[in-house]
Amino acid sequence: MADIIVAIDGFSGTGKSSTAKKVARALGYTYIDSGAMYRCVAHYFIKHQIDFEKEKEVAAALDKILISFQFNKMLNTSEILLNKKIMDYQIRLPEVDEIVSQIAAKPLIRKAMVDRQKKLGLEKKMVMDGRDIGTIVFPDAALKIFMTADLHIRSKRRQKELEEQGIQVNIEEIKKNLAKRDDLDANRLESPLIKANDAITLDSSYLTLEDQVKKIVDIAKKIIHEG
């Protein structure tokens, strides 16, 4: 048996985070939401009115940003903390959606986050989801999954997620933001969203969350036992 890293990449709204959380739980692995790290940066920049086009401001802000993870035993889930404060709906708001891809495309920010992510993966036994996990962060990961889904279905999922938090957003606005983010993610110069050559594609459009998790866990267990 071998300890491995499971890298799950894909577009926003494909169910990466929900799937990755449950895969980690099923394997007894640590779950790291890399996208939430960039969302924490975006939230901090909005709150403190940081101009992400100015490198000196960005560098100074990054020095003040502490991102950490903890496991909540009562809720049986992983939580992300920004400067020791648990982040939840704050980093999923439309205002964060609008700028997170632009922030993630900045080389200074990207390098800082990737360096932190690589340190988190030193112990292996981890599931990390994002957009460049299998290509940049952990190119040697034993299992790489690339998730896709229909844009309208992704928009409905995001709308439901926001409504459950009491936030009402028009689905067309969500669809517009997702399409814009898809384009920014796929075409940015720094760590673009592309499928790794050895990644397995998983279209989640018409799969239940349980189906997605089972497919990945079955593959992961086979790799772990063969290792």
Positions of the model-derived regions?
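Walker A/P-loop
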Residues: 17
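N-terminal phosphate/diphosphate-binding loop that engages ATP/GTP or pyrophosphate donors
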Residues: 26-92
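Hydrophobic anchor at the beta1->P-loop junction of P-loop NTPases
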Residues: 6-8
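ATP-binding Walker
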Residues: 14
